[in-house]
Regions:
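Bilobed "Venus flytrap"/periplasmic-binding protein-like clamshell domains
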Residues: 42, 47-70, 82, 105, ...
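An extracytoplasmic/periplasmic, membrane-proximal ligand-sensing/linker region
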Residues: 21-48, 54-64, 236-238, 242-304
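Short helices/loops that flank or line small-molecule/ion binding pockets
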Residues: 86-100, 113-114, 146-147, 190-211
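Pocket-lining segment of extracytoplasmic ligand-binding domains
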Residues: 151-250
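Bacterial N-terminal signal peptides that target proteins for export
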Residues: 1-9
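C-terminal motif of bacterial Sec signal peptides marking the signal peptidase cleavage site
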Residues: 16-19
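Extracytoplasmic/secreted proteins, especially bacterial periplasmic and envelope-associated proteins
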Residues: 57-64, 68, 87, 91, ...
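Acidic, polar ligand-binding/catalytic clefts
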Residues: 90-147
Length: 304
């Protein structure tokens, strides 16, 4: 009996040491095992944007585009709305968005850990370029940009090209920042609200996207009539749609085809136009590089 007991103990010890000797067989209960990745077709595709006009003006067309993508892809698509360009960049940088509608400024300022690539650009009225309008109240005595020095100026967003950065680049020539040039600045977060702020004399001036201004002329002519344009700043490429670089190649190709053909769907044309988009076209990455260099120069000046 004693011999049998010893043999049982030795066998148990052998099993124990065999298990400990093989690292792969060791179960560490301090670690959380990752759940198996769901097939791409089962996971929602996350599409993110930040509104350039008031949310009530912008959200509806993006909801329609999200539903359209879900229908064409045959899988769930989740829309995420962020308040501003910086929040949107952070979401993309964290890898929490598969597709994002970035503003021109947000794209040229992007330096996130998550690599991204261009998928499409917006075309409006036959062009992929837009201008920055500097506006004042219709009854203002201000006639040019120089006369805005020391005045109150409304910006849209710190990373909006037409709503901030274009003015930064204009003042870069004088090695000045807007904080040094204007008496006071504030942010409205939407182009239409910047127009409203100037029209109601909350700001002496503002910088806005010419395409948004022209859209407001059509949809709210009473508001547009209360402001006037005193300057135009350099043209810039429209904001792009980007995707995570590590998204499956076949998914990227499918998304390209859907976006490029979206305007061919008669039901989607008015949806796109309400978001100041005529169609999506293949991107030209070279158009953004000069702005990226200007942004870096602006950062250096701001840090001095």
């Amino acid at each position: 009996m004693a011999k049998k007991a010893v043999l049982l103990i030795l066998a148990a010890l052998a099993l124990l040491f065999a298990g400990c000797g093989d690292e792969k067989g060791f179960i560490n209960f301090a670690r959380h095992a990752a759940a198996p990745a769901a097939p791409a077709a089962e996971r929602p595709l996350v599409i993110a944007f930040a509104p350039v006009m008031s949310p009530e003006e912008t959200r509806r067309p993006y909801e329609r585009m999200t539903a359209y993508l879900a229908e064409k892809l045959g899988r769930p698509v989740t829309m995420v709305q962020k308040r501003g360009a910086a929040e949107l960049d952070q979401l993309v940088a964290a890898g929490e968005a598969d597709v994002a509608f970035l503003s021109t400024g947000a794209y040229t300022a992007y330096r996130g850990h998550e690599p991204i690539e261009l998928l499409a650009m917006v075309e409006t009225k036959g062009t992929i370029l837009y201008r920055t309008f500097v506006i004042v109240a219709a009854d203002s005595e201000i006639e040019d940009f120089a006369s805005l020095k020391g005045r109150v100026f409304a910006f849209v967003d710190p990373l909006s090209h037409s709503g901030r950065l274009a003015v930064d680049y204009r003042l870069l020539e004088e090695r000045l920042t807007p904080e040094q040039y204007f008496g006071r600045i504030f942010y409205t977060h939407h182009h239409d609200k910047s127009i409203w702020a100037v029209a109601n004399h909350l700001a002496d001036g503002a910088s806005i996207d010419n395409q948004i201004y022209e859209h407001i002329e059509q949809t709210n002519p009473q508001l547009a009539a209360k402001v006037r344009i005193i300057d135009e700043l350099a043209v810039a490429p429209t904001g792009p749609i980007v995707v995570r670089q590590n998204l499956a190649p076949e998914e990227k190709e499918q998304l390209r085809r859907i976006f490029y053909e979206m305007a061919d769907d008669e039901a989607m044309r008015p949806v796109l136009q309400s978001a100041v988009i005529d169609r999506f076209v293949p991107p030209d990455g070279g158009l953004y590089e000069p702005l990226r260099q200007k942004f870096l120069a602006h950062e250096r000046l701001s840090g001095e």
